[in-house]
Swiss-Prot record:
InterPro entries: RNase_P/MRP_Rpp29-subunit (IPR016848), RNase_P/MRP_Rpp29_sf (IPR036980), Rof/RNase_P-like (IPR023534), Rpp29/RNP1 (IPR002730). This is Ribonuclease P protein subunit p29. GO terms for cellular component: multimeric ribonuclease P complex; nucleolus; nucleoplasm; ribonuclease MRP complex. The modification Phosphoserine is found at S10. One of its GO terms (biological process) is tRNA 5'-leader removal. It holds the Pfam family RNase_P-MRP_p29. It is found in: Nucleus, Nucleolus. Keywords: Nucleus, Phosphoprotein, tRNA processing. GO terms for molecular function: ribonuclease P activity; ribonuclease P RNA binding. The gene is POP4.
Length: 220
């Protein structure tokens, strides 16, 4: 008798009595009503098909992609580059005429850097620009040196390191000139600039941030 009185109501009995179902039935009814409100344009059959296959995303969801860290390729060290002789100029390429186009490019580069070299251009301005400029391709001459054999050597600058200049002469000879204890001149369009090698012992990439004194010592 007790089991008959307290048995669960069927869906029809609940609807007839206007009684809300409890437990699992109530949860299912709530979910279906919620989905119907959330997807008003979707037909019941389409909604049912979606539920059978996968979860329905009710809000806009952005999946954050993990950024994979790119491994930087490790380059060769300075020692390895020297051992591989990557900076050596091959004998068949040690020809003055081969680098004349480089000199013409350098002259145009300096003209652009100085906004045009005119007769009324201030020499101090040109000097300041040249001290920070890339000199590869410039024609340089040794005017003073503690080693007399260096004096008078003139050629196109091919390579520059912290302590030396490598130049190619008109006789197609590659010369290595130390900066220390040497004074060099650079000429372009009638303007002559002096470089005191002892104060110039920097890599070309470091000179752009270097502050040179307006009046340096002329001692070798």
């Amino acid at each position: 008798m007790k089991s008959v009185i307290y048995h669960a109501l069927s869906q029809k009995e609940a609807n007839d009595s206007d009684v809300q179902p409890s437990g699992a039935q109530r949860a299912e009814a709530f979910v279906r009503a919620f989905l119907k409100r959330s997807t008003p344009r979707m037909s019941p059959q389409a909604r049912e098909d979606q539920l059978q296959r996968k979860a329905v995303v009710l809000e806009y969801f952005t999946r954050h992609k993990r950024k994979e860290k790119k491994k930087k390729a490790k380059g060769l060290s300075a020692r390895q580059r020297r051992e591989l002789r990557l900076f050596d100029i091959k004998p068949e390429q040690q020809r003055y005429s081969l680098f004349l186009p480089l000199h013409e490019l350098w002259k145009q580069y300096i003209r652009d850097l100085c906004n045009g070299l005119k007769p009324d251009t201030q020499p101090q301005m040109i000097q300041a620009k040249l001290l920070k400029a890339d000199l590869h391709g410039a024609i340089i001459s040794v005017t003073k040196s503690k080693c007399p054999s260096y004096v008078g050597i003139t050629g196109i600058l091919l390579q520059e390191t912290k302590h030396i200049f490598k130049i190619i002469t008109k006789e197609d000879r590659l010369k290595v000139i130390p900066k220390l204890n040497c004074v060099f001149t650079v000429e372009i369009d009638g303007f002559i600039s002096y470089i005191y090698g002892s104060k110039f012992q920097l890599r070309s990439s470091e000179r752009s941030a270097k502050k040179f004194k307006a009046k340096g010592t002329i001692d070798l």
